[in-house]
């Protein structure tokens, strides 16, 4: 009787182990990672980037009650200003289009540049600035955002841009 009971128990345990699903590539495509989480200095808002496998990231801003306030595709490197009035972030181009351009060996100066997004937390207004190279905000002072942009792409007339590229 003891041997029969042991054999039945062994069969049940081995069948339970065999039912576990093995991870494959499709599971990694839907796997979410939270990156660069930050909180305002007054503690009323949190911001994080949600990365889904090899796809574009999403920037999400939530209030202290975990209600979604703002969500933007292709956004990353988000920061809050010191006075907790604005969220500043970079908007990237679609990863698929960038990979396609790299595959076609497009020159680096013809690749699309990033956009700076500034979201007003008080009145929910979004302002965008194109052709951004980088940006910085002060850690303990508010009211300023310093950014650099590509002057040639932003202000040059179209006929001058064509002459420079030739």
Model features per residue range: what roles?
Residues 18-166:
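Beta-propeller folds
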């Amino acid at each position: 009787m003891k041997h029969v009971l042991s054999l039945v128990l062994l069969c049940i345990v081995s069948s339970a182990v065999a039912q576990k699903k093995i991870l494959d590539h499709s599971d990694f495509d839907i796997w979410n990672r939270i990156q660069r989480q930050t909180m305002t200095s007054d503690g009323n808002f949190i911001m994080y980037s949600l990365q889904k496998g090899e796809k574009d990231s999403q920037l999400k801003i939530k209030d202290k009650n975990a209600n979604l306030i703002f969500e933007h595709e292709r956004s990353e490197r988000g920061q809050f200003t010191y006075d907790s009035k604005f969220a500043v972030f970079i908007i990237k181009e679609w990863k698929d289009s960038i990979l396609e351009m790299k595959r076609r060996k497009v020159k680096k100066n013809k690749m699309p540049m990033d956009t700076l997004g500034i979201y007003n937390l008080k009145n929910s207004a979004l302002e965008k600035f194109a052709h951004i190279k980088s940006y910085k905000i002060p850690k303990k002072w508010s009211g300023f955002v310093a950014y650099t942009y590509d002057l040639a792409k932003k202000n040059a007339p179209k006929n001058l841009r064509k002459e420079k590229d030739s």
